[in-house]
């Protein structure tokens, strides 16, 4: 098992990608701590998995980041890996640059970016005194390939990519690695809820592999960065998107239409 006896803290982990990460890490032998605001839901999940425990964290309350890390250290003695899975978007409100309100922008920055900064800072202070560790940020392909909408979400995720590299450089002296995983369109409950058939078909046209990703596939990438197999890897931005963003199919379509004329 790749992660045997590693202590791994996963934030925002009761559903979707976060839950898939918890399950995969547990399967690989890790002792996993689910950080969540809904402790009842977290405990229900933990009860179904071996080696999984719960700690409280509310991303809207800055004081809970240091207490979250302290709770894990008190129980396990140390933290080997932090997985920052914070992320929120505001469909229908997070629009283009000209039409997104300042509060929507600040909400995304606070939850998506500030949370990663504060959780990473709290964990790194501990890791620096205990031989190092690995910080893994779940960003988004939306922070790598600019969109025509979701200016707040995309900007916050792009900043996480920068922060990942900065942490990697500045904390290397403490043997702390930091990498990011950028999921593309992933088949979670939240995505399926807001995805119309028309939009699904349109989006799939722009994914070379022709399908949405699975939460378990994102979890596999996380396990790599959490494992000793990536001991010499830091500051990397790994896109797991089925090839989305590699090409410009819209441009190709326009060229073909022009030629046909």
Spans of model-derived segments:
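Short C-terminal tail/terminal secondary-structure segment
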Residues: 234-261
